[in-house]
Amino acid sequence: MVNFVHKLRKGLLLFSIPTLAIAQQGEEPLPISLDADSSSFDRDSNLVFFSGLSIAQGDLKIEANEAEATGLDFEMSEWIFSGNVRISIDSTIIRASTAEVSFQTHELSTVNLLGDPAVFEDFSAARAIDIRGGASILKYDNQARTLRMTDGAWLSEGSNEFRGCDLIYDIDEEKITSGSSECGEPVVITILPPPTD
């Protein structure tokens, strides 16, 4: 009986170590700050409205003339930003007319941006040339850290340019790939040789 209890304790200890390790690896989300010129709450629609809004969390910042949200609980909320939408993520700045933003577990999940076009610039001190791109529709996935450009997509790095109907830019890796080929348009890459002296 004593041997059984000893084995049971040992088994429970071994079972709890991975759980403890997983709990220690998980980081708490960073605090979210929200500043607005004005706000109002519509009890009938259960929506919150803002003007002159700025939301910041770590290296993420979202600014817009106006916004509406399904609530202030960032556990799971949907936001629509409109008018001079500007999103900063690390060294990347995205500009659009409107943006639909999803927050889950107190962190940015996805952003769907519309513009004529919606554009981005990725500035990096380690790189001599900025990367720029745009399309009518941009979709940012925070977990994958990718920016998908569809409908008139283009991306340039210096004098080199990519064009297509679906391009994907990996912010961390600074890589461009073509997405779906279902639109029937090929990816066109223009590479200009450096000027000769």
Regions found by a protein language model. Name each.
Residues 1-197:
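Mature-chain termini and adjacent capping regions
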